[in-house]
Amino acid sequence: MEMALRPQSLLCPRSRLKVVIRPASSASGGGLAQYFLMTRRYTGSRIVRCMVSSSDCPNRKAKRTISLHTEVASSRGYAPRIAAESSIQEREHINSDEETFDTYNRLLRNESTEWKKLDTTEVDLSQDVSSSSMRKVDATDEAKLDILEDDLPRNLLNGVTMGEVDMLDEAGAEDDVFEVDLSALHNSTVGKMDAVNEVGTENDLFEVDLSALHSAAVGKVDVVDGAKAKEDLFEMDSLALHSVTMGKVDAINAAGAEGDKFEVDLSALASNNSMIEAVNVMDEAKAIEDTLEVDLSGNATSSSTYGEVKFEVDSLGNTSSTVMYGPADGAYEPRSDEVTFKVDSSENASNNVMYGRADVVDESWADEGIFEVDFFTNASSGAEYGKVDVVDEAKTDDFTFEIDSLEKDSNNKMHGKAHMVDEAWDDEAIFEVDLFGNASSIPIYGEVNVLDEARADDGKFEVDLLGNTSSNSTHEEVDVVDEAQTGEATFEVDLLGNALSSAIYKEVPVMGGAQDDEVDVDFSINASITETEKEADAVDEARVEDETFDMDLVGKQISIDSMNDDVVEEGTKHHRYPMLSSAFIEVKTIHETPVSLKPELMSVVMDQEQDKPISSVYQQEGSIFNLHAENQSTVDFHEREQMAITFDKQKESVAKLSKEDQQTAGLPEQNMSFDGVHRKSQSIIGLPFQHQSIVSSPEKYRSIVGFHGQNQSIISSHKQDKSIVGVPKKIQSIVGSTKHDDSIVGFRKQDRSIVSVPEQKQSIVGFHKQDLSIVAVSEQNLSIVAIPRESQSKQISIVRRHDPLHLKEVETKDRDGISKKSGGDDDLPHMLFEEELSQVEDVARAIAYKKQHEVDVISLTPDIQESPQDNIDPQELRRMLQELADQNCSMGNKLFVFPEAVKANSTIDVYLNRNLSALANEPDVHIKGAFNSWRWRPFTERLHKSELSGDWWSCKLHIPKEAYRLDFVFFNGRLVYDNNDSNDFVLQVESTMDEDSFEEFLVEEKKRELERVATEEAERRRHAEEQQRMGEQRAAEQAAREQAKKEIELKKNKLQNLLSSARTHVDNLWHIEPSTYRQGDTVRLYYNRNSRPLMHSTEIWMHGGCNSWTDGLSIVERLVECDDENGDWWYANVHIPEKAFVLDWVFADGPPGNARNYDNNGRQDFHAILPNAMTNEEYWVEEENCIYTRLLHEIREREEAIKIKVEKRAKMKSEMKEKTMRMFLLSQKHIVYTEPLEIRAGTTVDVLYNPSNTVLNGKPEVWFRWSFNRWMHPSGVLPPKKMVKTEDGCHLKATVSVPSDAYMMDFVFSESEEGGIYDNRNGTDYHIPVSGSNAKEPPIHIVHIAVEMAPIAKVGGLADVVTSLSRAIQELGHHVEVILPKYNFMNQSNVKNLHVRQSFSLGGTEIKVWFGLVEDLSVYFLEPQNGMFGGGWVYGGNDAGRFGLFCQSALEFLLQSGSSPHIIHCHDWSSAPVAWLYKEHYAESRLATARIIFTIHNLEFGAHFIGKAMTYCDKATTVSHTYSKEVAGHGAIAPHRGKFYGILNGIDPDIWDPYTDNFIPMHYTSENVVEGKNAAKRALQQRFGLQQTDVPIVGIITRLTAQKGIHLIKHALHRTLERNGQVVLLGSAPDPRIQSDFCRLADSLHGENHGRVRLCLTYDEPLSHLIYAGSDFILVPSIFEPCGLTQLVAMRYGSIPIVRKTGGLYDTVFDVDHDKDRARVLGLEPNGFSFDGADCNGVDYALNRQQSLLGLKPAVGSTPSAKGSWSKTGPGTGLPWTTLNCTIQLTNFEAPIQRWQEKASIGRYYKLNETWLKVKIFYLSCRYKLTQTWFKVKIFYLSYTYICRIKTLYSMHKQLWEYVSAMFPILSFNYEYLI
């Protein structure tokens, strides 16, 4: 059986070599595990491991296992390459006709319903072999989250080494987990390392476990790194017997924590010179300096202090027969300046065993931290000496770490010293290690010097290891230059030995671009037995596109002798390879190597097209390839099959070291290793600027591997879409992994604790806070793995299934490749260069592939079940499949699956008989499908010809656990389909999931996605707001500085002018003694009042200041009369201010506030210059700083006040919305309501219905029909439900379950289950909003076409409605635009970013289109170039023609701009032509999806246009419910009443808000309404020159037209003035006659009632705000009013409306006496006064009722309601007070009549009778007999058209007279005279 991977995948280049995986044989007949990676675009990838039968054991059952504990996340569908290799054991070749691998599908999916950006990869490595080695590398990259988990069960014998490294990079995760488990038996080392690098984590957890038996090391490392972490946890524990070191280190590093702990426990359990040490460290965030010194010696006591941290050690012991024991406890005082540690140790043991404990305090934010430990023992068989000196300065110049170890042993002596200086923020970082030993057999000397300059121009890293041993000596030198942001970086390693006479030296210089990093690596070793040379040349180009990586590994067997130079044009790179040509080294190395360690010949798979290998080398331990048996080939899934490592433009990989040469500077096995924990970027070995950490403790051989740069990795690095993973044999890494079973979970700060680990599995690891690098520990091999944050994301290539290739063919090519190996050296650089150049082509090809093939993917989940065929003998399986195939073929079935029972979370084989399908003649067969009715995980997969007899094609499909049904079709990859006769193929899946539960699952998935999007959006907004805030702060600081400079300049000029006029004295007037004085002195000022203005005053006071009164009045002294014959002299003692240069003063006859007469030197004041007083520059600088500080403080106070106001306003707005929604729900409670009243998604509600108020009254049954989301919910219209009676018997009830994705519940009622009569709310249905939904209502596109818009073109309420309505709808999330004519009078200052967008021609006229923002609304202005809108008015001449052209231009603009609105909303007669123009000319165009909404704002004008628009529109509305009933009988409306609705207008609460209104003197809410209205009232009186008295003010804001009741307005003016009130009127008349009439009235009233009335006969928007706020009442006496906004604004500002009951006034104002019940039904409260009549008596009746308010004060603490009223009322009245600022006492309001009684006669009130009416009306030229018929027919003649509402004779008489009398002044009749 054979297995192949197809390279033509989404991101694999087509030019890549095809790779074949061959099975390995073993003695037992089982094949070695093969790994395949299956990924999907959005969720993840999976590793499937298969045991495949090989030719030598054909009967062995193929075993396929699935790893259960690994997940890999990838957001882009990338997946890592996988290196798969066979066993060491030799095996026979398998011919192509003997056996092949099963071809595994690569299941890809891209689902629209799953929004997780998560890729999962799983790895399970297990084997039970002897003397074998196995390696598996998996890397996964992800932009947000990378998770990979691994389980390493091992059962190893002697000489077996296995390792695995799992790394996890979670860019946005909350926790970091890093775990390593190393265990081995008998000189074996098993290592595992889990690394988690988390940029934004909350916790940092690091754990290491090392345990070993018989000189074996077992280690576990768990690392969590978080750049913003609050806490770092470090834990280590090790246990060993027989010369084994054991220690435990617990470290907590909290950069911002309140307290940190660090504990140390050292213990030993060994009989022969064992030492157990543990160090516990406490890191405090706020300390200044930490110093720790420990000196433990057999008979010594040491105490030392460093800086401000004290550490004392007192030890006593007898080494001959005692044991040393020492505890150390640390005490830390947060924020203190001194920390003291004391250690007292003593020895009481017989075998020289040392036990110690130390507690250490480290401060990650300290200025300097020093850690020093000195341990010394004098045991006969083993001694150790160590010293550690650490200086941790996160932002200082030095970081020093020193280790000095000395072991005095007869056979093994070692001296080591390590010194490190790391500067995370400075120009230089130095790291030194000096290890020197004088032992006779294995002396080692080493020195490491590291220079790391994260921001400098040069960095060096040097290692020099020199040995003088006869059998084995080593010299190493490493020179590293790390330039994270510079143009060149150099990395150089020189390994040179002196054992042989020949040496190998290689140098590879690389030159890059301006932004490149250059790295030179030179490794060489000369030894008598083995020689190894390695060289790696890496170029890191952080900002360029191309890069080249060249590595040559020459080890125990050197197969490549030389390479040609290579010059790359892009990012110039030079390669030089000087090598020794002697073949003796290679041959001798191979022959002298023990058999068990000999490398085997190994080749990279060849390119089949060129039949040429990239390179073929012998196995080199530590390289990318592993040890193999003879004639075995290994596949490494790199994008271009590279020998060692590739790297990309942003990431670097440095080198791979062999087993013998991979070492890290640290302590020997017998010595304790110390690990540094620091704040930013500091560790033990060569760390980059922000990504550094090293931990190591190998057994004997120590070396240094440095890494550097911003984001660099030792093991691997990537290009933009490339992942290379290669590690040494014993240290293997998997990028991004965790383990389910035994990972250590990081906790949040408040919940975190130190997590314990197994007793014998603890070791040490150093780590840092931002980016984590990991070092795995093994017996003789040490690999340094750096996993930068960016190198683990966005750079994973997908390995897809390859076409099958025969093994024999591959083996032949392998042999050809080996035979051509000698010539491969010349080709390798060229091939590597070609590989780099092909990367851009690969990316382009991948993009093209994506566009052409939208292939959705499915990934295998981590808990996938085993297929049944895995446990079946292959031959038996084949027999079963053949039987099924024959059976289905005989039955005519073209399809079957195996296993026949399809279960969720399993894998099936799908077989298709191509001959029986529509694809019989097609060469390619694909399957396309999805799950759960095509709603979940769509996929496309290719079928392959199976081995079954017949034309059976097959593939494997994974059934996800969420599936309950599989839907699919077959096709040829293009247009030919077999879809089961248009029915699709369907397979039912045995699953716990059903359709309902799947719906719930989708809802939850959607909810999670919405939460994620909301979180991202909130973070984006927060970041934008922060950037804006910082920008505003910088601007404010700059403005404050400029203002300060201006003020200083003014002061300088003023003081300069003052100095010229100042004097030291004035003869015979004033003088100062002493004559010489300075600032701070006290002097005596003399004043002669003789002949001065104060000559007769009994008291004289001095009022003074300094420097031209800069600080105001600061000196006040009373003068004392002195006895002087030369005049009337007075004096006072005056203290001169410190900053005074000129003294200023005047004299007065009293102290400030009581003085009446002054002597101010003739209005010039008195000025005395201080002697020798000269202002210096320092004074002005200080003065400028003071002014700047004051201004800045004022700015910050204003900003803080604004912030508080915005928050409060948002809260008030939210409360108002909630209250409005509640009122809306209560407003229809008499018909239907729900319990609970507010419906929440995911809950159950009861719908209660009262049919007695509907068309279903009296019906025996009522059925409830409902759905959700405007009847568009996926569940559709649900089956009708019969309603049942409630306990009260008045309502019917139905219980409804609300899904989680519902945002609106829609329902109607019917009389039967089949339908019948419906109650559908007059065709609009019932709709109740649902809160808490995880779905949002889809936005709709609305375009308003109008001729008015506030505030830029306003005539009446239409302008306000257009703006307010548009803003309100836009706030709901919809897309709103407004189209408006561009008037030449328009105030363009209110239009933001006004500019020309386009132009077009209509009927020969060019229309220019402008665009701008008005009140945050998108507005398009249409400007015809014929000047139609250049007249300076909205309504004027030829309005019909002008507005007709505008309407057609608006529709043409929408068409030509490509807009597709859902709703086109036209307003009033002026834009009514839109309705019929659209239906006649645009209904079949791109605008066909639009619907026309027409709103009538006033039927008084353009009735014929309105009637035509009513015919063509889809829906029509007017601005209030009452007005819709009043005009329903109009000829333009009546034929279309079925689509006519009344919807009440509203105001914009953001525009009309007293809390933010800048046109009123004081902002106020319900909390300070009294103070706010008092301030506004005073400002209003002052503005109009009114008397500042506490009387009621009646405000009138209106257009002066007959509709507005101008005769009632005049009457109200006179009546208010008669009762000592004040009146303010703001408005103008479009009719010049009415305007002139009011001008005469104004002149008359202003003269007669000066200071009590003011008529402002114009319109002033800012002034209207002040009138609304300062008035107590707002009068709106309209004869008719469609809606009216004035009363709404009045209530918003706390003024009581007095209105006439008509139209919208009746709908919004509820009389405090008559409308209590009506308000209660609607969930409101009474809020004003209203009257019925249209005469003066009605106005009087409303005004006089204020007498009921005598002695009442406004309620404080009330809040405006949604309508603008207040929620609390005045005592005893029920009146909601928004209004009065004081007690309202209308004591002079004399009412001529009392309140009307409903049953009273007409004669009682008007002293008129029916006879009088008949006579007088006839006299008024009615000329008709006044009969009852006349009243009914001719009442219209008297201008009242609503008499039909009057039902009783009394009402008719009463109201008739009101209407008749109202007409008298209009007709110029004096009815009093007539009477």
Curated annotation (Swiss-Prot):
Residues 1007-1065 form a coiled coil. Signal peptide: none annotated. SUPFAM superfamilies: UDP-Glycosyltransferase/glycogen phosphorylase. Disruption phenotype: White-core floury endosperm. Increased content of resistant starch (RS). Endosperm containing increased levels of amylose. Reduced content of long amylopectin chains with a degree of polymerization (DP) of 30 or greater. Reduced content of amylopectin chains with a DP of 6 to 8 and a DP of 16 to 20, but increased content of chains with a DP of 9 to 15 and a DP of 22 to 29. Decrease in average length of amylopectin chains. It comes from the Eukaryota. Pathway: Glycan biosynthesis; starch biosynthesis. InterPro entries: CBM25 (IPR005085), Glyco_trans_1 (IPR001296), GS/SS (IPR011835), Ig-like_fold (IPR013783), Starch_synth_cat_dom (IPR013534). Its main location: plastid. Keywords: Amyloplast, Chloroplast, Coiled coil, Glycosyltransferase, Plastid, Starch biosynthesis, Transferase, Transit peptide. It is found in: Plastid, Chloroplast; Plastid, Amyloplast. Residues 1-49 form a transit peptide. It is an enzyme of class 2 (transferase). Residues 1014-1043 are annotated as: Disordered. Its EC number is 2.4.1.21. CDD domains: GT5_Glycogen_synthase_DULL1-like (cd03791). GO terms for molecular function: alpha-1,4-glucan glucosyltransferase (ADP-glucose donor) activity; alpha-1,4-glucan glucosyltransferase (UDP-glucose donor) activity; starch binding. GO terms for cellular component: amyloplast; chloroplast. HAMAP family: Glycogen_synth. PANTHER family: PTHR46083, STARCH SYNTHASE 3, CHLOROPLASTIC_AMYLOPLASTIC (PTHR46083:SF5). Involved in starch synthesis in endosperm amyloplasts. Plays an important role in the elongation of amylopectin B chains. This is Soluble starch synthase 3a, chloroplastic/amyloplastic.
